[in-house]
């Protein structure tokens, strides 16, 4: 049954090529209002999840493994990601960008070395860009991504 009518619905925004329309639709809904209801927070969480998937090696076309390798990659990435985020310190300089271009970020990501660290850097940085573009990050709150160098 999975190979039939629900196959593509399962992937939704979970892979990089498929993410744009799903994330754009969510951002459009959220940018028109203050996020205050449980449903709006759920939508924001969904967008963040899709962005994280976009910058996860196993969710991209260049990943050639099967589902078992996909699951193994994500299991190995999870503790590395937690350690990565926990290791970020509050930056001294404040930084704010109002422009979020996921396609540009993803093109940069595709040209990087494939590694857990690359995934972590792009997931954190792109998620902050999304939150910033929705003005959920206040001016007085320094962004963690100022510590992450995405340039080659």
Show which residues each predicted segment covers:
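N-terminal leader/auxiliary helical segments
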Residues: 1-152
